[in-house]
Amino acid sequence: RLGFMKNDIEFLNAGYTKYSAPAKLNLFLKILNKRKDGYHNLQSIFHLIDLKDDIFIKIRYEDTQINIKNSSSQIKPSSDLAFKAAKLMLTNHNLGVDIYINKKIPIGSGLGGGSSNAAIVIMAINKLCKFNLSKINLIKKGLKLGADVPFFINGTNAWAEGIGEVLHSIKIPNFTYVVMYPDLSIDTKAIFNDFKLTNSLIPLKISTSYKADEHDFIKNDLEEQVFKNI
């Protein structure tokens, strides 16, 4: 079993490598239409913020076990995206991995914590095991786990389209955001499933920058549905 360590030094002394998995904000969210596969086409601006989970990873060369511990009791190992990411990367390789995640991004907050964890695990295993997969191939693997994972693998602020996997770099001024967490957990998938589109909407023009005065017009199409589900 994977044990708990008291601090970063103990992890590092035990042979782990530390990684940071950042959260993201959706500066707006426009739902365009629902696809035949059940996903929704959308437009958004994904903005990385400095709220981060700490992830400690150590490759197991002696067996193929995938062991994962999460500081949040809300997440079962078998349903953890980080576990699924490790399994995806190590299938057909005679290797295992120990992963410990110190959660700082609130669960069910819409900040992309699970997707970010999965992205970091994918990139870390690629580096530690010297698989030398390209970023494009890593993004393709990440998309199998969730629509937001490619964004975190890409690692830069982006104008997002498709189901969130079509990314265009965007320049954003150095804004300060106050992120308030009301101690509520919302299932993003359930919110999308419950969302009722009244009609297909016309897409916005792709932007390469985001200005301060545009904050007055930002809107989240899922906001009303979220409050209905609280």
Describe each model-derived feature in a short phrase.
Residues 137, 141, 201-203:
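Glycine/GP-enriched mid-protein hinge/lid loop-to-helix segment characteristic of carbohydrate kinases
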Residues 109-135, 139, 151:
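DPxDG-like acidic metal-binding loop motif
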Residues 34, 104-110, 142, 151, ...:
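Short glycine- and Lys/Arg-enriched binding-loop motifs that mark or flank ligand-binding interfaces
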Residues 61-76, 121, 143, 211-221:
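Short, basic/glycine-rich phosphate-binding loops at helix/coil junctions
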Residues 66, 152-154, 159-230:
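Conserved, helical-rich catalytic subdomain that frames metal- and/or nucleotide-binding sites
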Residues 4-109, 127-136, 172, 181-182:
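ATP-binding N-lobe of GHMP and related small-molecule kinases
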